Curated annotation (Swiss-Prot):
Belongs to the TRAM family. The gene is TRAM2. SMART domains: TLC. Interacts with SERCA2B and COL1A1. This is Translocating chain-associated membrane protein 2. InterPro entries: TLC-dom, Translocation_assoc_membrane. It is found in: Membrane. Residues 112-321 form the TLC domain. Residues 1-22, 97-119, 181-191, 236-250, 309-370 are cytoplasmic. The lineage of its organism: Eukaryota, Metazoa, Chordata, Craniata, Vertebrata. Residues 348-370 are annotated as: Disordered. GO terms for biological process: collagen biosynthetic process; protein insertion into ER membrane; SRP-dependent cotranslational protein targeting to membrane, translocation.
């Protein structure tokens, strides 16, 4: 892992060299961009990597506010923050997770899952706080009608656009991390599924100008995922601690219901009642019946798939639990061997002395002297 003291050197730009030094390589690239800010010739190009592009001034009653829309230059900004995320990933891994896992003495399988949950706990916790702050300051919680009113939401505030760029950067960085972290082949399909699922939903909300609805749905989803991975960390620390899993199971079903309700309310009813329903990609308007059906189908299919996996996992867990209980009941108790009766011819022994049947010691026969 990056930033560690290494005792073994690898050939330059070899596979092992890149794996063990990928965070250092990313840090060097980020440093080059930051150095570019110091010179007037390269400052404009450096700002292209660091700051969101496509800003416009929107006049208001008091003054002007700066808003943003998306474009191809966003890919450059996302690339820069992919390297930032790789560096932060390595810092969390080395200075937090590795120190904790050494004390727990986990197996290889549990160690891999512990690292995965540890990284996602940090990410989900940060994203929940950030997303909640954006939603509250922009007034999306107090005014639910703003999720579909004035669509298309082409002009985004700075914090909304920056949030989406960082989200895309994080989930894109998770793809090469599968290679850098040497994830087991059995785990790669499962992780690819939820990485691609997040990328499709976040990019879809960003490109289809459904950013307000996307923020609310991400807030709900990330809150549930944070609870799940926190429960898994506590389980790895103490296998008897499963109380948080019960809380997560209750929250999971409620979250699926809320996500489906909000999606149907905003897309199926809110956007359907808007007057402007013409397909106009140049103006960012995708409010047509076909687009609404596709978005609703995607959201409903994703929630149904997550719910099916949840039910399947719960049934398997209960089946294993009842099998263990039935196995314990089938184990026969070890029979006690009957006490072995000792046949005594006359009297019995007590403390090494022969006793008569009436409890008295037999008198020793005196020998007559000749």
């Amino acid at each position: 892992m990056a930033f560690r003291r290494r005792t073994k050197s690898y050939p330059l730009f070899s596979q092992e060299f890149v794996i063990h030094n990928h965070a250092d390589i990313g840090f060097c690239l980020v440093l080059c961009v930051l150095i570019g800010l110091m010179f007037e010739v390269t400052a404009k190009t450096a700002f292209l990597f660091i700051l969101p592009q496509y800003n416009i001034s929107v006049p208001t009653a008091d003054s002007e506010t700066v808003h943003y829309h998306y474009g191809p230059k966003d890919l450059v900004t996302i690339l820069f923050y992919i390297f930032i995320t790789i560096i932060l990933h390595a810092v969390v891994q080395e200075y937090i997770l590795d120190k904790i896992s050494k004390r727990l003495h986990l197996s290889k399988v549990k160690h891999s899952k512990f690292n995965e949950s540890g990284q996602l706990v940090v990410f989900h916790f940060t994203s929940v706080i950030w997303c909640f702050y954006v939603v509250v300051t922009e007034g999306y919680l107090t005014n639910p009608r703003s999720l579909w009113e004035d669509y298309p939401h082409v002009h985004l505030p700075f914090q909304v656009k920056f949030f989406y760029l960082c989200q895309l950067a994080y989930w894109l960085h998770a793809l090469p991390e599968l290679y850098f972290q040497k994830v087991r082949k059995e785990e790669i399909p499962r992780q690819l599924q939820y990485i691609c699922l997040y990328l499709v939903h976040i990019a879809g909300a960003y490109l289809l100008n459904l950013s307000r609805l996307g923020l609310i749905l991400l807030l709900l989803q990330y809150s549930t995922e944070f609870l799940f991975h926190t429960a898994r960390l506590f389980y790895f620390a103490d296998e008897n601690n499963e109380k948080l899993f019960s809380a997560w199971a209750a929250v999971f079903g409620v979250t699926r219901l809320f996500i489906l309700t909000l999606a149907v309310l905003a897309i199926g009813f809110g956007l359907a009642r808007m007057e402007n329903q013409a397909f106009d990609p140049e103006k960012g308007n995708f409010n047509t019946l076909f687009c609404r059906l596709c978005v609703l189908l995607l959201v409903c299919a994703a929630q149904a798939w997550l719910m099916w996996r949840f039910i399947h996992s719960q049934l398997r867990h209960w089946r294993e639990y009842w099998n263990e209980q039935s196995a314990k009941r089938r184990v026969p108790a070890t029979p006690r061997l009957p006490a072995r009766l000792i046949k005594r011819e006359s009297g019995y022994h007590e403390n090494g002395v022969v006793k008569a049947e009436n409890g008295t010691s037999p008198r020793t026969k005196k020998l007559k002297s000749p």
